[in-house]
Amino acid sequence: MTTNDTYEATYAIPMHCENCVNDIKACLKNVPGINSLNFDIEQQIMSVESSVAPSTIINTLRNCGKDAIIRGAGKPNSSAVAILETFQKYTIDQKKDTAVRGLARIVQVGENKTLFDITVNGVPEAGNYHASIHEKGDVSKGVESTGKVWHKFDEPIECFNESDLGKNLYSGKTFLSAPLPTWQLIGRSFVISKSLNHPENEPSSVKDYSFLGVIARSAGVWENNKQVCACTGKTVWEERKDALANNIK
């Protein structure tokens, strides 16, 4: 990423005083690409202007013993997300089993440039995985029902780190860009596969391990200030606990 790829993102993070703010600043001070940090202690919100992947911000804070939830990124109608699930059944661990294998956070930073923060966790084979966007958002039959490849990413996702979901499982992450506006992505499917050929809707092409999800709009910066979900009645931190339990990180 370049300095021209900067965008603003807001994060919910527990803080109660200036000492909390100073601890957060110290935690993030060595992360390259952060231009500015601003804090609202009363609302427990941190605003970050940077060219850094949201997952990097969140993971860095977690390594310092703090948690954070991204609340919004980019301008209105410029952000999206896809929760990536496998349609191939196997058990990881009875206590940790989940269909989720990854997450793609998406934010547009220019008229024709969008960033993709991709995390993968719990894949059964170490190695390079490959991302693509398919023309349809029908995931009822896995990759087979998503149609043709609409855009493919040439850079691989390197998954060689041990996963926290169980033995012989692997994780990885990457931060990619594409010359696409976010509005063209909504409703399509985001697919990650072990296959370099980016499998399409042919049964013979989905033998390689793959996982996918529908791309949905997400909040822009300052568009989401809810503290309690109207659907579940849970606080954002209770929902965060549920998300982590389902491998949404």
UniProtKB/Swiss-Prot annotation:
Protein name: Superoxide dismutase 1 copper chaperone
UniProt function note: Copper chaperone for apo superoxide dismutase 1 (SOD1). Binds copper ions and delivers them specifically to apo-SOD1.
Keyword RNA-binding applies: no
Cofactor binding comment, as recorded: Binds 2 copper ions per subunit.
Key words, A-Z: Chaperone, Copper, Cytoplasm, Disulfide bond, Metal-binding, Mitochondrion, Zinc
Encoding gene (name): CCS1
Domain HMA: 6-69
BP GO annotations: copper ion transport; removal of superoxide radicals
Source organism (scientific name): Saccharomyces cerevisiae (strain ATCC 204508 / S288c)
Phylogenetic lineage: Eukaryota, Fungi, Dikarya, Ascomycota, Saccharomycotina
Chain sites annotated for binding Zn(2+): H16
